[in-house]
């Protein structure tokens, strides 16, 4: 069975990092305690893509931000395709400058789940043996709640920031991002004007025999879309040609399949 699970205490590392930065001590225990129920509630919001319906997730996250008294904005790139963001403003230095902004980004949509292959309801957020199960617990509603709890803790600390910190939840990552980040970049470019750093999915925490390791990812391969066209002499299925457009296309695809592309390691 393919499982999606996240450890109840997974947000601890992020919150401890936030706490260590603050000049005044804050009690992060309430934010740790809120993480599990907030994640369970988020997993119970159906944002399976297609069709997405990410505006449901926007409403859920917006309510949590409202409870904390944090202003936020949202926009639909298409009916039901919601995107949300909130900002903690940085304090300018003596010269009136702030450092490049930091964005905490995750996507609201999740891929479909075949309940027949699950031992729990994929939209239940059921807790079993210290784990929370649900579609999106790892990809990426778990990340979204970790980031949210860190964001809420940072806001509660009232620590002066040397940069803006954004919390951003977007639509459509699982189907190309055209209604999510792609749409925002095209239609709301001002949101990213001062951004210098963006923390997103990719790296993760893994448990090995030797202990827990935090995997850091700095880049990804990107897709290369190709269109192959083959031509040949037409004929009839009852008397096929030795070489046709179809056989040429199949041979071409086989050459692509057998090609070993060199590894290009990009310095971090």
Predicted regions and their residues:
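Acidic/histidine-rich catalytic neighborhood of metal-dependent amide-processing enzymes
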Residues: 131-132, 138-215
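Flexible glycine/proline-enriched surface loops and loop-helix/loop-strand junctions
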Residues: 210-212, 229-236
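Sec/Tat signal peptide C-region and signal peptidase I cleavage site
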Residues: 21-25
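Acidic-enriched catalytic cores of C-N bond-cleaving enzymes acting on peptides and small amides
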Residues: 189-193, 203-210, 217-223, 237-268
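Short, solvent-exposed loop/turn segments at the edges of secondary structure
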Residues: 81, 120, 162, 193-194, ...
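Bacterial N-terminal signal peptides
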Residues: 10-20
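Bacterial N-terminal signal peptides that target proteins for export
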Residues: 2-12
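Acidic/His- and Gly-rich active-site-bordering loop/insert found
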Residues: 26-135, 154-163
């Amino acid at each position: 069975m393919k499982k999606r699970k996240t450890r109840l205490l997974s947000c601890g590392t992020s919150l401890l990092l936030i706490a260590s930065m603050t000049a005044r001590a804050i009690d992060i225990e309430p934010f740790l305690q809120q993480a599990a129920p907030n994640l369970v509630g988020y997993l119970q919001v159906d944002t399976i893509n297609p069709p997405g319906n990410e505006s449901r997730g926007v409403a859920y996250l917006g309510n949590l931000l409202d409870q904390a008294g944090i202003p936020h904005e949202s926009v639909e790139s298409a009916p039901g395709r919601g995107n949300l963001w909130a900002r903690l403003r940085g304090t300018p230095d003596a010269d009136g400058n702030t450092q490049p902004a930091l964005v905490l980004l995750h996507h609201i949509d999740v891929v479909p789940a075949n309940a027949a292959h699950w031992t729990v309801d994929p939209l239940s957020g059921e807790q079993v043996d210290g784990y929370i199960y649900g579609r999106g617990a790892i990809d990426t509603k778990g990340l979204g709640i970790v980031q949210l709890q860190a964001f809420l803790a940072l806001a509660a600390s009232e620590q002066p920031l040397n940069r803006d910190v954004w919390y951003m939840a977007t639509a459509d990552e699982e189907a190309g991002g055209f209604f999510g980040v792609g749409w925002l970049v095209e239609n709301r470019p001002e949101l990213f004007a001062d951004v210098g750093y963006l923390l997103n999915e990719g790296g993760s925490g893994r448990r090995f025999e030797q202990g827990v390791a935090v995997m850091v990812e700095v880049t990804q391969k990107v897709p290369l879309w190709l269109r192959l066209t083959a031509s040949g002499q037409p004929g009839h299925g009852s008397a096929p040609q030795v070489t046709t457009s179809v056989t040429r296309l199949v041979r071409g695809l086989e050459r692509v399949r057998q090609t070993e592309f060199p590894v290009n390691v990009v310095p971090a």
